[in-house]
From Swiss-Prot:
SUPFAM superfamilies: P-loop containing nucleoside triphosphate hydrolases. The gene is tmk. One of its GO terms (molecular function) is dTMP kinase activity. Belongs to the thymidylate kinase family. ATP binds at residues 10-17. This is Thymidylate kinase. It comes from Nostoc sp. (strain PCC 7120 / SAG 25.82 / UTEX 2576).
Length: 211
């Protein structure tokens, strides 16, 4: 059985982390070997980069292009050290964010050059794309309200303006429209149980082809 790469995407507070965990437990109950990972931070180097990227904005300002390059460095290490080897072992990888996050956040949110972003993504991934991407779609204000309710403080990205987060949301909508077979929209504002059931139904269709 070959490995599969399943990515979870969405704006802040969309519920990716909890849905990934529920999905992992469900897949494991089917006898599938699952790996949970994330970007940034899927390797030891990535954890250091994550601390730099997500520290509060007032601590150490990061230039926008620097931010883009740090995300690319995190991804290149992640792909080489974790993703490709685990897929070669037949693992099912559930990943919290991947290339679409860079397009949505740095491309749409920061208005950085999209050609540069695609070039860096191509270099960092070595051509590795997701088998399927689950986009948990929530209104940005709902998502940010969820994050504030966590009582853990907002990180540098979460502290951005509503206008920034709305541009990111538009980025995801455009990506889903341009890649409807790879990116599947799920209404993230439904109950946790309903969202999980929807994801199960989506993946069940693919599992019939994969297993």
């Amino acid at each position: 059985m070959g490995g599969r790469f399943i990515v979870f995407e969405g704006v802040e507070g969309c519920g990716k982390t909890s849905q990934m965990q529920l999905c992992a437990e469900w897949l494991q109950s089917l006898g599938i070997s699952v790996v949970l990972t994330r970007e940034p931070g899927g390797t030891e180097l990535g954890l250091d980069l994550r601390r730099l990227l997500l520290q509060k904005a007032e601590d150490k300002p990061i230039a926008e292009v620097t931010e883009l390059l740090l995300y690319a460095a995190d991804r290149a290490q992640h792909v080489a050290q974790e993703l490709k080897p685990k897929l070669a072992q037949g693992k099912y990888i559930l990943c919290d964010r991947y290339v679409d996050s860079t397009i949505a956040y740095q491309g749409y949110g920061r208005n950085l050059d999209m050609n540069l972003i695609h070039q860096l993504n191509d270099i960092a991934t070595g051509g590795l794309t997701s088998d399927i991407t689950i986009w948990l779609d929530v209104d940005v204000e709902v998502g940010l309200a969820r994050k504030r309710g966590d009582n853990v403080g907002l990180d540098r990205i979460e502290q951005e303006t509503i206008a920034f987060h709305r541009r990111v949301q538009q980025g995801y909508a455009d990506l889903a429209a341009s890649s409807p077979k790879r990116i599947i929209r799920v209404d993230g504002q439904l109950s946790k149980e309903t969202v999980h059931k929807t994801i199960q139904e989506i993946l069940s269709v693919h599992l019939k082809q994969w297993l």
